[in-house]
From Swiss-Prot:
The EC number(s) this enzyme carries: 1.15.1.1
Entry-linked PROSITE patterns: SOD_MN
Organism encoding this protein: Babesia bovis
Name of the protein: Superoxide dismutase [Fe]
Cofactor binding, per record: Binds 1 Fe cation per subunit.
GO molecular function annotation: metal ion binding; superoxide dismutase activity
The encoding gene: SODB
Its biological purpose: Destroys superoxide anion radicals which are normally produced within the cells and which are toxic to biological systems.
Pfam families: Sod_Fe_C, Sod_Fe_N
């Protein structure tokens, strides 16, 4: 069965002024959709058609892995943001952050600095480690915390250039600083309770 592009959890204009409608139309409508179409073409007529996205990420390499991981990563990224979100975390996620980093401010600085300094394309993640502590990790290109056993994803930020170049040009840090105004802490709290499933 062919995979379908998941619907965005908000409208194309609802992340303005932090992410423009033009960026979303290209990022979601071209890049994310392109990964879905490419994956479907790669697995059509093969036993992989019966696999879930997670199974493809964990069990495959090369182009199948890259496209499956990018589909999952982007879906998770869209859900990591929302209109009327941002601000400081509340609930259990705040406690996890403060236990690990001392304060939300310290966490925010560490996360921003890590992503601003990330070389090339990739992703920044807030994860829950196996020992129950929160941590910040980065993955390169289509890298996945699931594949690399880096912990359970709680939030992510996309630092591929197509995520920000229309709005911020080469100023990645300004994009990251603006992204904090969109962070969906309710989504992070849900991921503390149970792992996110794409399919």
């Amino acid at each position: 069965m062919a995979f379908k592009l998941p619907a965005l959890p908000y409208g194309m204009r609802e992340l303005i002024p932090h992410i423009s409608e033009e960026t979303l139309s290209f990022h979601y409508g071209k890049h994310h959709a392109g990964y879905v179409n490419k994956l479907n073409s790669l697995i059509k007529g093969t036993p992989l058609e019966s696999c879930t996205i997670e199974e493809l990420i964990l069990g495959q390499t090369g182009a199948v892995f890259n496209n499956a991981a990018q589909i999952w990563n982007h879906t998770f990224y869209w859900n990591s943001m929302g209109p009327n979100c941002g601000g400081e975390p509340t609930g259990p996620i705040r406690k996890k952050i403060e236990e690990k980093f001392g304060s939300f401010s310290a966490f925010k600085t560490d996360f921003s600095n890590l992503l601003a300094g990330h070389f090339g394309s990739g992703w920044g993640w807030l994860v829950l480690k196996d020992d129950g502590t929160a941590d910040i990790v980065q993955t390169h290109d289509a890298g996945s915390p699931l594949k690399e056993n880096l912990g359970r994803p709680l939030l992510c930020c996309d630092v591929w250039e197509h995520a920000y170049y229309i709005d911020y040009k080469n100023d990645r840090l300004s994009y990251i600083n603006s992204w904090w105004n969109l962070v969906n802490w309710d989504f992070a709290n849900k991921n503390l309770e149970a792992p996110f499933k794409w399919s």
